[in-house]
Amino acid sequence: SLTPMSIMAIVATNLKRGQCIQYEGERGVVLGLEHRTPGKGNALIAATIRSFKTGKTKTIRFASSEKVDIVETDRQKLEFSYSEPGTYHFMDPTTYDTIGIDEDFVGDAKNFIKEGQVIEILFIEGNPVSIDLPDTVELEITESSEGIKGDTANNPTKPAVLETGLTVQVPLFVKQGDIIKVSTKDNGYLGRAN
């Protein structure tokens, strides 16, 4: 039986990054907060929020004394075990329980998740609503052509396929078997891992 979702109202000035709120009929996670005091006006809180439904971010302005509905969430650190068509399987490292998460929900995060990696997944009422990836991940290059010798004009790059299947542009000196750092924000190459 479904219990009513735990929601509590707090004053906007007490909002914190990472909290989940209900707003304009949607739910989302607070990514950033900015306190603004325009001229003689009242103080405002500009909250950058990512919608769980659409994945899009937008800025919502609250009066600092305005009440905001906080949704109770459960943040779990889960280890990626394996995937099969349609489902990604994660394990709770403390209880060893496994949980299957729909591939559509995992979305582009699959490009950055490898077996044995621990990531944070946010749940509301037992349903996953958000995957929190680290800003950078280290992945092995499984396929890459040799760079063309003498081609050094304008920082040339070449495509490389990583162990997750993601293709990124890398400098010519990087080779198959290298482990590189990749940005989860823009798929950018950030250097070789030590």
Task: Tell me the role of every PLM-derived stretch.
Residues S1-I7:
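Short, Lys/Arg-enriched N-terminal segments with co-localized hydrophobic residues
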Residues I7-N194:
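Acidic-enriched and Gly/Ser
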